[in-house]
């Protein structure tokens, strides 16, 4: 049969599903780059530890990277993870954050080894793109991020949203071919008393909240959108010492 033409976006999520299916007794595997085979097989009940969410952890890596000093412990995360977004630890190492793994936890520590620029293909980790766009710009690290074509059809058009909201903070981003976002250090005047719009997108709210680490404050509209994936995000920020007020 004819195989489809095109790219598979977020392949690690498919691999995560296959791995969990196999863990619970199914027989599922890739036949080739585009085809899967799943055999008739009942699932089996087994003890299973549910790992914490690496996508949510990315915002704490972001906070550590933007801080002058930081040591943050994140429970429930494994060095060997099925989650594609566990790649966040490797990428943030380029931004000066070391990941030290312990018993079902990871500790984030600052280092002075920071890349002068960051170019990365997010085809397999598109949900991390907003985190790194905001972080790199605020750290004054030029970047070129590719593999972002799925961002146009997420909860919102995330590429357009990032360009607009980063513009409010004084950063001029450029979109190339609907799949690349770049920043080469261009700045513009900040919007006075700017409030970040979230576009009903949980990741817009969580990626922009850490801006307050380097700016006096940040206002975020419709903060309740975080409930989709991290309902206790604001409460956890308060526990870490952030002052959050509803206006």
Language-model regions: role of each:
Residues 1-247:
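Short, structured segments at the rim of ligand-binding sites
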């Amino acid at each position: 049969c004819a195989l489809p033409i095109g790219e598979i976006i977020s392949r690690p999520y498919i691999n995560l599903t296959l791995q969990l299916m196999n863990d619970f007794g199914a027989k599922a595997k890739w036949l080739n780059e585009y085809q899967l085979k799943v055999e008739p097989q009942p699932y089996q009940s087994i003890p299973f530890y549910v790992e914490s969410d690496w996508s949510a952890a990315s915002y704490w890596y972001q906070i550590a990277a933007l801080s002058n000093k930081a040591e943050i412990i994140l429970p429930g995360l494994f060095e060997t993870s099925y989650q594609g977004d566990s790649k966040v630890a490797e990428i943030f190492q380029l931004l000066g954050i070391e990941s030290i793994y312990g018993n079902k936890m990871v500790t984030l520590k600052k280092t002075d080894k920071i890349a002068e620029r960051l170019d990365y293909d997010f085809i397999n980790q598109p949900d991390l793109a907003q985190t790194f766009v905001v972080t790199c710009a605020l750290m004054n690290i030029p970047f070129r991020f590719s593999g972002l074509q799925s961002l146009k059809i997420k909860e919102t058009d995330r590429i357009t949203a990032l360009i607009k909201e980063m513009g409010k903070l004084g950063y001029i981003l450029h979109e190339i071919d609907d799949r690349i976002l770049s920043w080469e250090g261009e700045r513009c005047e900040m919007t006075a008393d700017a409030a970040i719009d979230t576009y009903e997108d949980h990741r817009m709210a969580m990626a922009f909240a850490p801006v307050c680490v380097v700016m006096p404050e940040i206002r975020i509209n419709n903060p309740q959108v975080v409930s989709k994936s991290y309902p206790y995000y604001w409460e956890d920020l308060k526990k870490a010492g952030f002052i959050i007020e509803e206006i």
